[in-house]
């Protein structure tokens, strides 16, 4: 499920990040898979500018903050980037603008009234924690994905499929509990965290 990708050393050594964050990136790099693809920026100056479109974004980032690009997440058309804030090392998801109900097809707007996906969201408390979580999820999700690819045959009793689905949910729960162990700001029981999205996105790929 992917290979290691490391950032350009000359650039990272100039980044305004805690030394432990720079060391983690240079030593371990990040996994490369179909959903989260490392996209390390060149140069010493952070290039990501968060769009503080509303209150939810301003709870996560502050005016004037800039981020170093680490990862391209999801489809290119979505322009989702994961970056680390210069000075603090916090890791955030950045997109050009919030996604609102106005972005849905007209037939879907009523059923999604009030939908709001902010342009800035918290991912991890530090690069160190993001790197460790990324690698541990990368390995664990490989096992969970194998389980997802091996469901009971359609003609088997419903109880077997229910048991299979329960095992898959248990795998996800274990993974998210380990994420919380690494970073206490990412609650295992909070389905709105981005790590929860990563876990369920990979194990339910194609559903």
Residue ranges and their predicted role:
Residues 1-87, 96-99, 173-207:
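A surface-exposed partner-binding patch
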Residues 5-12, 111-118, 149-151, 181:
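Charged, low-complexity surface segments at secondary-structure and domain boundaries
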Residues 9, 22, 62, 124, ...:
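Generic detection of intrinsically disordered/low-complexity segments and helix-coil linkers/edges
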Residues 16, 118, 122-125, 159, ...:
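Alpha-helix boundary/N-cap detector
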Residues 49-55, 105-114, 156, 162, ...:
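Surface-exposed intrinsically disordered loops and tails
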Residues 89-147:
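Compact, glycine/acidic-enriched structural inserts
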Residues 135-179:
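An amphipathic alpha-helical core segment
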């Amino acid at each position: 499920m992917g290979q290691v990708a490391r950032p350009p050393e000359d650039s990272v050594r100039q980044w305004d990040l805690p030394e432990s964050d720079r060391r983690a990136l240079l030593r371990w790099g990040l996994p490369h898979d179909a959903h989260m693809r490392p996209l390390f920026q060149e140069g010493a100056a952070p290039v990501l500018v968060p769009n503080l479109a509303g209150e939810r974004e301003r709870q996560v980032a502050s005016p004037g903050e800039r981020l170093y690009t680490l990862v391209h997440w999801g489809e290119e058309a979505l322009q989702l980037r994961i970056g680390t804030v210069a000075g603090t090392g916090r890791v955030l998801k950045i997109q050009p603008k919030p996604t609102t109900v106005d972005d849905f097809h007209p037939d879907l707007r009523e059923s999604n009234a009030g939908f709001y996906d902010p342009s800035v969201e918290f991912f991890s408390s530090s690069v160190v924690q993001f790197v460790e979580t990324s690698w541990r999820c990368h390995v664990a999700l490989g096992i969970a994905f194998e389980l997802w690819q091996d469901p009971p045959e359609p003609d088997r009793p419903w109880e077997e499929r229910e048991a299979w689905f329960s095992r898959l949910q248990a795998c996800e729960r274990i993974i998210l509990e380990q994420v919380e162990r690494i970073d206490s700001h990412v609650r295992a029981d909070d389905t709105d965290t981005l790590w929860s999205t990563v876990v369920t996105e990979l194990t339910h790929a194609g559903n």
